[in-house]
């Protein structure tokens, strides 16, 4: 008889209470929030910026794997099997026969998607893991305000049938780019995804409104909600309770307090 201690491994996500719906998860993690605060600070520069992005996404992807990915029971001989027939581990692991696609939305999503891809290759069967690439551009008006998004090009390796499709994109500002990319996968890429999940460092109420309206089936994981331009009566209330009054975007569609344009700072675009 084997020990059944790990036959059903519990995992409970630590998340902030809110009123945005069951598919939105605002991860409550003091360590990651500390790292994110450093990442967004004015004096933080390269190479620390990209190092922090790597660390944050490594932990965020692990959180999503723990919370969302299916598991299976395994019986695996350990190195002690040569000494005793009891040298066998039996318990749950992440199902290695899971198909997963991570989507790089360039530029800001390039490093997060690579981190996600590398970690997935060590978690499930690498032959079932794929990374796709989308070139996305913001459309701006004469006042430099964002008015939309357009796809400039894409490298999509195949279908997404029964796959977990992950979109690691640091800043959920307007939701325009992600919504457009997700719509592309829903309408142009063959197959029906098993689950679509976005992984964001920071999101705004406006982003959540758009995503939950246009893609109510999509699951959202974020480390922080920024609503810094909301009226005073919003502060101190539970996120989403006064959703219509919450505001996290300035007139140029940048997040406040935010951390600036991540596509720029991650690539030293100002040099």
Regions found by a protein language model. Name each.
Residues 1-271:
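PRPP-associated nucleotide enzymes
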